């Protein structure tokens, strides 16, 4: 029997390991068997990077607000743009107003394609699942929780600075409350990846099988 596509958000603060967890879940044969189908992953940030490079109207609107982010060739300086956004809440809010509608449409397109191919579970990775409006289009969400010290160590280990971590972490201070507000299931990500995969898989199985017989 064909089962409907289930769309679940995967959120968490910076350096919480969202992408690593998503990749492990996509590769988990045990999860596929438990929910009765394939698992795929879409990253909102990746979709946004594509949109910034291909959507001229979006790029022009962004540059109107942050003109110093324009490179000599007319493209966006993403690093400078991110620095401005994390340093100035007004810039962050304006960017989100411009970008999230584009991301929601892109994820809707990905979702339709996945459903047409018979995918069982689509993991939607995004930090701002609540205020982006994405949560309203999902069947549930997971909140990956990792101690701040661990996240800082991970961020620095992959080449970031401690100061940059503090700026980005502070800018995301409201994320946990937003995720709680949309009913996200908390997942402890402070342990090993296999432990986190197990906990997330259990939660995903419950979300996928809601309203269905588990016999």
Predicted regions, residues:
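ATP-dependent small-molecule kinase phosphotransfer cores
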Residues: 46-119
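P-loop (Walker A) phosphate-binding loop of NTP-binding proteins
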Residues: 13
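ATP-binding Walker
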Residues: 16
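Hydrophobic anchor at the beta1->P-loop junction of P-loop NTPases
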Residues: 10
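Walker A/P-loop
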Residues: 19
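ATP-dependent NMP and nucleoside kinases share a basic, alpha-helical "lid"
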Residues: 108-116, 121-157
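Small-molecule kinase domains that catalyze NTP-dependent phosphoryl transfer to phosphate-bearing small molecules
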Residues: 107, 131-137, 156-215
């Amino acid at each position: 029997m064909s089962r409907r596509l289930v769309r679940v958000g995967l959120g968490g603060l910076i350096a919480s390991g969202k992408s690593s967890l998503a990749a492990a879940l996509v590769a988990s044969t045990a999860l596929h068997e438990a929910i009765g189908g394939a698992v795929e992953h879409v990253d909102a940030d990746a979709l946004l990077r594509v949109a910034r490079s291909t959507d001229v109207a979006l790029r022009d609107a962004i540059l109107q607000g942050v003109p110093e982010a324009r490179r000599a060739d007319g493209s966006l300086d993403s690093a400078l743009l991110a620095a401005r956004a994390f340093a100035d809440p007004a810039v962050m809010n304006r960017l989100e107003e411009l970008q999230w509608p584009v991301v929601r449409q892109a994820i809707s397109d990905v979702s339709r394609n996945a459903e047409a191919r018979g995918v069982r579970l689509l993991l939607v990775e995004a930090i701002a699942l609540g205020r982006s409006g994405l949560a309203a289009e999902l069947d549930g969400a997971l909140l990956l929780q990792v101690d701040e010290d661990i996240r800082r160590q991970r961020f620095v280990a992959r080449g970031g600075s401690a100061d940059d971590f503090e700026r980005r972490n502070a800018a995301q201070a409201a994320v946990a409350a937003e995720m709680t507000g949309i009913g996200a299931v908390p997942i402890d990500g402070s342990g090993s990846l296999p432990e986190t995969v197990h906990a997330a898989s259990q939660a995903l199985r419950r979300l996928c099988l809601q309203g269905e017989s588990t016999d």
